[in-house]
Amino acid sequence: MVYLQKQDKEVFDAIKLELGRQRANIELIASENFVSEQVMEAMGSVLTNKYAEGYPGKRYYGGCEFVDIVEDLARDRAKKLFGAEYANVQPHSGAQANMAVYHTVLEPGDTVLGMNLSHGGHLTHGSPVNFSGVLYNFVEYGVREDTKEIDYEIVREAALKHKPKMIVAGASAYPRKIDFAKFREIADEVGAYLMVDMAHIAGLVAAGLHQNPVPYADFTTTTTHKTLRGPRGGMILAKAEWEQKLNKSIFPGIQGGPLMHVIAAKAVAFGEALQPEFTAYCEQIIRNSKKLAETLQANDVAVLTGGSDNHLLLIDLKPLGLTGKAAEKVLDEVGITVNKNTIPFETESPFVTSGIRVGVAAVTTRGFDEVAIEKVGVLISEVLHNLENEEVLADVKARVANLTNEYPLYPSL
């Protein structure tokens, strides 16, 4: 960043501070990851200068012959990665990918069945504060109060009752596997479209460690970061018959020019995900997640559903008499980054919450194995049991520093 350092020291200094934070902290926010240096290089390339409204071979601007190569690479790699007939890599985010699908087959006021946000869903799955809940008539399904897991018979009953035009499967805070085949059966029974938002688990799906929704869903959306370990962005997968309508929904429907530097970075990340090393990485994610859940529970910290099948888990703080807001703050002070999160049947506000969400994708990228993640579980437990004990917190902070020093992040930057 030699040019930035010379020309804009304020921005340069802020970026360096953030790099220092990422290096020094144990990053456990489930939606975050550390991209490779080559993904960052693509993001910072001259492609940021190029406007390319339209699609490869059908642009509204001249001079697109080389960005066409990049977008074709991204689309082809995405289709290969997930076994899809069609891929659109232009959505700027997962939210815009979801918006485009809704825009393709729904009319304002149509009924959609989606997962309750506090039970693990997402804002774009019908939250009243989101465009989805404003434009469409979303009705909810959730998890069982006893197991905190999806009960597919309850989903079926809701579908039969409300007769939705679309069912949305997928979650932002659900630690167990989702059976997309069962969702397909329910959708077929009521004549609904099925959209799967696999944003959190896309990397695990690509690695063959979670059921692939693409064969079952009419539309599959995802972000390209999180477990897929690419740049921040979105993507839509579907059968070839939807190509024309979905393309129009993205452009000119809800977006203008695509971000070609981001699409290049997506292509790089998809190429990485096609390698055997990526499968090994995702296998380590699962091992780490299970070890973290096991360690927390052994140290009297409540883990919802008793464990995890993916990269994340939810901690229930009610037995400890804590709030997510308080726990997030103190954990951050000792160098452990998590986010407060609502839990099923929540009694606190979304700004306070009764839980925290913890994910291991980023630390696994950093090289943490089961031995290291067990240490992380012990550190979290010590903080949660000693939230106001300055001596314990100081000791944890020192041990966090020792642990992160063992696993250098971006040493070449």
Curated annotation (Swiss-Prot):
The keyword Cytoplasm applies. The modification N6-(pyridoxal phosphate)lysine is found at K226. One of its GO terms (cellular component) is cytosol. It is an enzyme of class 2 (transferase). (6S)-5,6,7,8-tetrahydrofolate binds at L117, G121, H122, L123, S349, P350, F351. Pfam families: SHMT (PF00464). It catalyses: (6R)-5,10-methylene-5,6,7,8-tetrahydrofolate + glycine + H2O = (6S)-5,6,7,8-tetrahydrofolate + L-serine. It comes from the Bacteria. Pathway: One-carbon metabolism; tetrahydrofolate interconversion; Amino-acid biosynthesis; glycine biosynthesis; glycine from L-serine: step 1/1. It is found in: Cytoplasm. Its cofactor is pyridoxal 5'-phosphate. Keywords: Amino-acid biosynthesis, Cytoplasm, One-carbon metabolism, Pyridoxal phosphate, Transferase. InterPro entries: PyrdxlP-dep_Trfase, PyrdxlP-dep_Trfase_major, PyrdxlP-dep_Trfase_small, Ser_HO-MeTrfase, Ser_HO-MeTrfase-like, Ser_HO-MeTrfase_PLP_BS, SHMT-like_dom. One of its GO terms (biological process) is tetrahydrofolate interconversion. Gene3D superfamilies: Aspartate Aminotransferase, domain 1 (3.90.1150.10), Type I PLP-dependent aspartate aminotransferase-like (Major domain) (3.40.640.10). GO terms for molecular function: glycine hydroxymethyltransferase activity; pyridoxal phosphate binding. Its EC number is 2.1.2.1. SUPFAM superfamilies: PLP-dependent transferases. The record marks H225 as: Plays an important role in substrate specificity. PANTHER family: SERINE HYDROXYMETHYLTRANSFERASE, SERINE HYDROXYMETHYLTRANSFERASE 1. NCBIfam families: PRK00011.1. Homodimer. Belongs to the SHMT family. Catalyzes the reversible interconversion of serine and glycine with tetrahydrofolate (THF) serving as the one-carbon carrier. This reaction serves as the major source of one-carbon groups required for the biosynthesis of purines, thymidylate, methionine, and other important biomolecules. Also exhibits THF-independent aldolase activity toward beta-hydroxyamino acids, producing glycine and aldehydes, via a retro-aldol mechanism. This is Serine hydroxymethyltransferase. It comes from Listeria innocua serovar 6a (strain ATCC BAA-680 / CLIP 11262).
